[in-house]
Amino acid sequence: MKTILLFLGVCAVGASMMTGGWTNKDVNDEEVKKLAIFASTKFNEKSNSLVFEKMCKILEAKSQLVAGMLYDITFEASPTVCKKNDKNYVPIYQCPLLPCAPRKI
């Protein structure tokens, strides 16, 4: 199993928020979804897998206010049938999962 964690610094932070520990975020929050998709895309760019991996479900999301904002997002991902070297580009959201493929965290 893999743990895919996303740590992103976001510069624009309101001064009214206190810095410190991790705060749980709603996994259905639109910002969390966008950041998880971004992390999944970066993972696919850097992995040596022959096929794309697709995010299936966000399991947990947390944020921490420091000099910017850090995010820790854990999600399940599974391999798809879409090959990275295929000349007929298919957007990742249209790629079906491999049958009986194990989900990775």
From Swiss-Prot:
Matching SMART domains: CY
Protein's cellular compartments: Secreted
GO molecular function: cysteine-type endopeptidase inhibitor activity; ion channel regulator activity; toxin activity
Coiled-coil parts of chain: none
Tissue: Expressed by the venom gland.
Superkingdom of this protein's organism: Eukaryota
Keyword entries, A-Z: Disulfide bond, Ion channel impairing toxin, Protease inhibitor, Secreted, Signal, Thiol protease inhibitor, Toxin
GO cellular component, one term: cytoplasm
Signal sequence extent: 1-23
Modifications the protein undergoes after translation, according to the UniProt entry: Contains 2 disulfide bonds.
PROSITE patterns in alphabetical order: CYSTATIN (PS00287)
InterPro entries the record matches: Cystatin_dom, Cystatin_sf, Prot_inh_cystat_CS
Record-linked Gene3D superfamilies: 3.10.450.10
PANTHER family cross-referenced by the UniProt entry: CYSTATIN
Function according to Swiss-Prot or TrEMBL: Inhibits various C1 cysteine proteases. This protein has no toxic activity and its function in the venom is unknown. It may play a role as a housekeeping or regulatory protein.
Family of the protein in this entry: Belongs to the cystatin family.
Name the UniProt record assigns to this protein: U7-hexatoxin-Hi1a
Organism listed in the record: Hadronyche infensa
Classification of source organism: Eukaryota, Metazoa, Ecdysozoa, Arthropoda, Chelicerata
